Regions:
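Peripheral (often C-terminal) accessory segments that flank ATP-dependent C-N-forming ligase machineries
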Residues: 120-208
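ATP-dependent carboxylate/phosphate-activation module, predominantly the ATP-grasp catalytic core
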Residues: 4-11, 15-68, 72-74, 79, ...
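Extracellular structured ligand-interaction cores
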Residues: 79-81, 139
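Conserved protein kinase catalytic/activation segment
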Residues: 89-92
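A broad, low-specificity signal marking well-ordered, structured residues that form hydrophobic/aromatic
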Residues: 11, 25, 94, 140, ...
Length: 208
């Protein structure tokens, strides 16, 4: 196994390809909990393309890398997802497959894109086009993790005040602890990036 260290930011590129025509639906910067938590993925934020020449070059490189990866793997009439590391001068494809990245379908739905309707159109031989969406504000999907051991309880008042969507993987009363992998999420939120919860959305009690 040959490994190489690449300095840059990690992105998830997700979309659909029909008749060898790839349509990129989302470009999201990926975040992690850091070294102390084994770099477990903590969420995504969609990247908006501006009119700057820097952004034009960045997105052009992403489009070229996506097309080359899909062609090399002979992926067509399918969903696709790429993990890339982007530095100042290049885009490196780390992984490419036919499944969307974790919960990206929910993020696309929040953006107004029904990815499953698009996929049905593809497999039934209908033509599809890139949907028009409002990209004026970045969309964030954040995974919720326990920072200690305890019994999980939902802070319903905070959930009701949150300007976004909240989904739970755990049920109230479940014993949870600090994460060892992405499968240990308590739940996740989707919102416009500026909309942060004003209060914790959950409690961890010492007893049920």
């Amino acid at each position: 196994i040959i490994e190489s260290f690449i300095d840059g930011d990690e992105y998830s590129i997700d979309g659909i390809i029909s008749k060898n025509n790839p349509i990129i639906l989302s470009v999201c910067k990926k975040y992690s909990l850091g070294k102390s938590e084994n770099f477990i993925m903590s969420g995504f934020t969609s990247v908006k393309q501006s009119s700057s020449s820097k952004d034009e070059v960045f997105f052009e490189r992403i489009e070229n890398a996506t097309a080359k990866a899909l062609e090399a793997l002979k992926i067509s009439d399918s969903l696709f997802s790429l993990d890339i590391i982007a530095s100042r001068n290049e885009v490196n494809v780390v992984e490419c497959g036919i499944l969307l990245d974790c919960k990206i379908d929910r993020l696309l739905s929040f953006m107004g894109i029904n990815i499953y309707e698009m996929m049905i159109s593809v497999i039934s031989g209908q033509s599809i086009s890139s949907p028009k969406v409002d990209n004026s504000s970045p969309i964030s999907l954040n995974f919720l993790f326990a920072n200690k051991s305890g019994y999980f309880q939902i802070n319903q008042d905070a959930v009701d005040q949150f300007k976004g969507q909240v989904f739970w993987e755990q049920t109230p009363g479940s014993l949870v602890s600090k994460p060892k992998s992405i499968s240990d999420i308590l739940g996740w939120t989707i919102s416009v990036e500026e909309s942060k919860p004003q209060k914790e959305l959950y409690f961890l009690n010492e007893s049920v």
